[in-house]
């Protein structure tokens, strides 16, 4: 049962992906005396990932280097709303989604009015890739390279790239793992 729930409600390529619906399955499996050790361990592992940066919780802070080599952190970004994008410039799907975001008129209007800021974080750590691609993003976006070890320290559940979060002014997660249609609403 857990494998089916995970396949349909957790995997990034599932059209039914919904971590909130997955939570009861994970909690039950993690606590079930009837489940074998593997199922309980798998449920615990996934539960830990799903509970990270859930809607309603404060997003984990991290440090990054900007295009102009300034050290910043997530919580210092002042914005009514912040679209946080974890991406890899060598990921074709990432660049397709970023291109869609750049072309979306509602997002552009909110960005230009100052209601929304976009922080795009390169998480992979390859300095030459970062230097070669950091200026491909629009100038009115904040582009950064992770220096906190987001992936290694599992600060965020980055099960697929790109991963998009929408945060409020207090850095509380409004939406997690959203698609472009959700941003425009």
Name every feature range the model reports, one short phrase each:
Residues 59-60, 82, 161-163:
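Short loop/turn microsegments at loop-to-beta-strand junctions
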Residues 70-102, 117-121:
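Short active-site neighborhood of thiol/selenol oxidoreductases, capturing the structured segment around
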Residues 74, 84, 92-97, 112, ...:
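Extended hydrophobic-aromatic, low-complexity segments
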Residues 131-165, 169:
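Short, internal strand/loop/helix patches
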Residues 166-185:
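Thiol-/selenol-based redox modules, centered on thioredoxin-like
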